[in-house]
């Protein structure tokens, strides 16, 4: 077993536990449950095949875990046992440090696929550093505004050469007010957080607690958020809070 209780009288805090390691200093594979082994395989195979880790939901689906909190608990346990290393600043940045000696069928397939794949793209160390893990924070209205959901739902790995750098987040567009600008309902907009905008930039803005995406416009009559659909009227924006600048639009075909 990986976890051993200290005998009575041992030094340390009450209830403290020690993770068993092998003589060579590596974590003991015998400490892993079948589910934890499966989680390691899923993470490893995703990194090998596509160059970045799976999402919390993908791990849960593969390991038979219904809630994201259960997945988070298992990841913490694997980190404690020394099989994973996680970056606290990048929730999806997970590094499998030690693997059990036995290979699953899926991991063998992944290794074979890696050997046949061209050594470029996500496997290039320089390009690998250009991936941004962008949080999805809900839906944004483009038309009749709806309240934006401010909880992070997911993290998407996106090429930094497309979305750039900075504090980024993603929102899904709902409505047709930006149709003539090519931003359609169901599209995803990547937004760089910033409190100001330049003339003509597309922005995500909060108005009376509701969020919308529009073109920023300022003239002698005031500040406006302009739609790109003649059936919608400009919105006065003197009291609007600029959430950020839209830097990319993504669409599923």
Swiss-Prot record:
Catalytic residue positions: 177 (for autocatalytic cleavage activity), 214 (for autocatalytic cleavage activity)
Listed Pfam families: LexA_DNA_bind, Peptidase_S24
Ion transport listed as a keyword: no
Compositional bias ranges of the Basic and acidic residues kind: 82-106
Enzyme class: hydrolase
DNA-binding region: 56-76
The reaction(s) this protein catalyses: Hydrolysis of Ala-|-Gly bond in repressor LexA
SUPFAM superfamilies reported for this sequence: LexA/Signal peptidase (SSF51306), Winged helix' DNA-binding domain (SSF46785)
Domain of life, per lineage: Bacteria
GO molecular function term, any single one: serine-type endopeptidase activity
Region (Disordered): 1-34, 82-127
Compositionally biased region (Low complexity): 107-120
Marked site (Cleavage) residue numbers: 142-143
Keywords attached to this entry: Autocatalytic cleavage, DNA damage, DNA repair, DNA replication, DNA-binding, Hydrolase, Repressor, SOS response, Transcription, Transcription regulation
Gene Ontology biological process terms from the UniProt entry: DNA repair; DNA replication; negative regulation of DNA-templated transcription; proteolysis; SOS response
EC numbers on record: 3.4.21.88
Family: Belongs to the peptidase S24 family.
Biological role: Represses a number of genes involved in the response to DNA damage (SOS response), including recA and lexA. In the presence of single-stranded DNA, RecA interacts with LexA causing an autocatalytic cleavage which disrupts the DNA-binding part of LexA, leading to derepression of the SOS regulon and eventually DNA repair.
Assembly description: Homodimer.
Name recorded for this polypeptide: LexA repressor
């Amino acid at each position: 077993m990986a976890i051993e209780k200290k005998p009575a009288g041992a030094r340390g805090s009450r209830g403290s536990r020690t993770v068993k390691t092998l003589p060579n200093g590596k974590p003991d594979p015998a400490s892993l449950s079948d589910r934890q082994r499966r989680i390691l395989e899923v993470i490893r195979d995703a990194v090998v095949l596509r160059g970045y880790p799976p999402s919390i939901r993908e791990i849960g689906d593969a390991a038979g875990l219904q809630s994201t909190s259960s997945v988070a608990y298992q990841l913490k346990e694997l980190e404690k046992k020394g099989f994973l290393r996680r970056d606290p600043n990048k929730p999806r940045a997970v590094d499998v440090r030690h693997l059990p000696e036995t290979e699953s069928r899926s991991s063998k397939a992944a290794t074979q696929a890696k050997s046949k794949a061209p050594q470029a793209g996500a496997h290039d160390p320089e390009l690998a550093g250009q991936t941004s893990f962008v949080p999805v924070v809900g839906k944004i209205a483009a038309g009749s505004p709806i309240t934006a959901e401010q909880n992070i739902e997911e993290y998407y790995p996106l090429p930094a050469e497309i979305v750039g750098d900075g504090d980024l987040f993603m929102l899904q567009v709902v409505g047709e007010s930006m149709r003539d600008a090519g931003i359609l309902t169901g599209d995803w907009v990547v937004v760089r957080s910033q409190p100001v905008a330049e003339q003509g930039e597309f922005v995500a803005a909060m108005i009376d607690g509701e969020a919308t995406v529009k073109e920023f416009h300022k003239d002698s009559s005031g500040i406006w958020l302009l739609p790109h659909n003649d059936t919608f009227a400009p919105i006065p924006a003197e009291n609007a809070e600029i959430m950020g600048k839209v830097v990319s639009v993504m669409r599923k075909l």
